[in-house]
Each structure stands twice: as structure tokens, then as C-alpha cells.
Amino acid sequence: MSGFYRAAATLSARFLHVPPVAESIYAHRSVATGEISFGRSDIDLLMIVRQPRGDAADGPELASLYGRLCWLRRFNPALSHVEVHDPAGIRRWLELDTYRSSQERRSAMLLRGKPVCFPDVAVRREDAVRRLCVWTEGFFSTAVRERNRRNLRKTALEIWCAFATAMGRIPQPCLTRPEIAARWAESEDAPLLDPLLRDPSTAPSVVFRLAKRLHGSLLPPLRPVSQPLVAQLLMPPRYRQRILVVVPEENSSLPREAFQPGSCLCTPELLDLYLHYMNPFLVWSCPQQLTGLGVQPPSVAEFVRGCLFYGHNHTLRNPGFMYRHTWPPAVFIEVVRHALPYLHAGEIPPPLDPRRVAGWIAGSPSPCEYYRSVFPHVYRESEEQWIQLQELEERLRSS
């Protein structure tokens, strides 16, 4: 079945490879590793486009490329995510996220164009912790909400892989879930695996237990909470409506809010990891009750890393290629514009007034309009912000 998917990916790459704009196209993730479930797996591509040129920053060319992708998706609906980088951006991303870099270096399959150099670097612990947070916030909560047994098992395996990498039990992330399961079965966490494989509904308990172990190795212990905490919030930095559901511990019953649209399910320990290793901006809208548990605010360095992670320039090309929303890039430019003066002064940025981004969210353009009219401006400002953020990170590291 992997041969069928790879053939479909190759044909898609041939259609999308439009020189001189599109320079390289890779298959990555499940198609590249051969871990295919027919009718369920998506075709995910990694595309390198040329370095943006002129005042338009290749916005019209990206709009045209998006149009080709829309046409192609009519015939190949499995073609879901196309992650688009420019040459300078892919180098930055591979240096910024060594976890993903390790996986791409060992599995990405060139389908069209010239090869990219994937650096062979050690996986940083902080990148593995952040990847665990990405899986829990972005995918695990969705699997719980949908009661999707396959995705509960899948995300729990990926979370253990990130956990084991962060704990130093494996030197680099596994590439397939059978490999993860085999390594897990050999580890000291093996007693958690059998219940998960027999009954994926135990995944929340397993994930929360792993998060507590990881938290204990990285951050001060938190005071216990007696009952679930539920809060509706506009979650920065992308300002999407979410329901934050914090359950006391790994064996807690899940409240009904955990199954509602937009839920974000966690324990206090998992939320603390998320705040310090992935999304420091959450402190702007975090319920006050959490500070009573001993959750500490993120540092200036953690805010800088958060800006670099969320503000990498490939996210400017997410609209249409990765996700349907077109407003997040401009919103995050506004977030960084607000934060930079405080970070330069060595201060934690205060909360951004949501009214400053409300206009972007309300007036979301179509992807073609975004690339022709908005992208050139956000691209130029993003590049200027990136230079400042890198200088800040180097200064903080040297001090």
C-alpha cells in the first residue's frame, strides 16, 4: 500500500514542481516512512520555494501555486499538508527544531528538484519536550475529544517517543510507531504500554503519568489541585477560542468539557511544561488559580524561544497549504511587535490587548488575496523581527 501512496505523492510533486519558484519537493512523515493505513493516511509534502524576490516577495507566484494545489486536491483529497519553506528558512528551521530535523534527515524522500542538506545534529532536550507539548496540545486533545481509538493510541506512542528522547532513554526520535512500541516495550515504562495497546481509552492516564515524570526531572513540583479547572479563553499567540481543561492527576475522570469543541486537556504538570517549553504567551490568559499551584511565569529567554518557534517564516506560508485560516501570520507579527521592546529591556511582555488583533481575525482574506496583498508585508517584517530575536537569543545565551 505504501507504493500506491508514494506513486500518488510522486505524481503530485510533478504537478506542483513549477520552476523557478518551486525548487524541491519531498515526501515526509508516513508516506516517507512507509507507515500507511489505506484510506486513513494523508500525503504530506515538504516544498522548498526560491528565496522571495522583489517588493511582492513572490506573493503572486505563491497564489498561483496555491491555485494548482486546489486543483490537485480535487483529484487527490489525501494531499492535505504541504509545508512550504524557502532555502534560508529551511536551514533555520532545522537548526531551531532538532527533533524534527533528526526525523527529516533520516526519512524525507526527494520526489522532485534538487536535494536539501539536512544537518546531522544531536537532538536538544528542550526540542524534545516542546515536541511532546505539540503532540499533547495539538493532537492528543483532539483524539480524546473525538474518542478516536486509533488516534489515541497513535498520539500516546508519539508522546512516549518525545518523552524518551527528552529523558535521554533514546538518542533520537523513532521514525515509525512500530519502532516506538518496540523501544517502549524494552524500557522501564513498559508496564504502561500493554494497557494502552489493549484499551486506547487509557491513553489520558498514560500520557499524564509520562508528563508528571518528565515534569519532575525539569521543573519544581506543583501543589496538588483538588478538582478540575475549566476555563474558556482566547488562547494566544494565535488567539483561537479554546476550553482549557486541567484535571488534578493521571487517574482523574474527565469532565464533559474535555469532549467539547476546542478543548485543551492537561494536568497541572503538563500545562507547566507547555508554558515553559512551547507557549509562554499562555501566561497572558492563564487562570489565576494556576499561580496558586506554584506555576512560575516563563522567563525572557523562554519568550524569545516562543517567538522564534511560532514566528518561523514557513508559518507565513501555512494559509491554504497547511491550514485554511489566513489570519494567524499577521496576528503573530503583531504579537512579536508588541513583545520585542520588553524583551530588549529584559522584561516579561505584558498581555497584548486582543483588540489589536481582532481586525485581522474578523477580516480574514482568501488564501489568494493573502498571498498577493498581505504576504509581502508580513514577510518583510517577519525577517526584520527574526534578526532581532536571534540577536536577543545570542545575547541571553552568552550572559
Each language-model region and where it sits:
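Extended, basic/helix-rich recognition subdomains
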Residues: 148-198, 338, 346
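Extended, alpha-helical interaction "stalks"
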Residues: 287-288, 295, 300-301, 310-314, ...
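Hydrophobic alpha-helical positions that pack around
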Residues: 330-334
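Catalytic metal-binding acidic patch
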Residues: 29-64, 81-83, 232, 245
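N-terminal regions immediately upstream of nucleotidyltransferase
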Residues: 1-6, 174-192, 201-203, 321, ...
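Conserved NTP/Mg2+-binding pocket subregion across the NTase superfamily
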Residues: 1-7, 62-162, 205-323
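Short cationic amphipathic helices and targeting signals
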Residues: 45-47, 245, 257, 264, ...
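Helical scaffold of the NTase/Pol beta-like nucleotidyltransferase catalytic core
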Residues: 1-26, 399
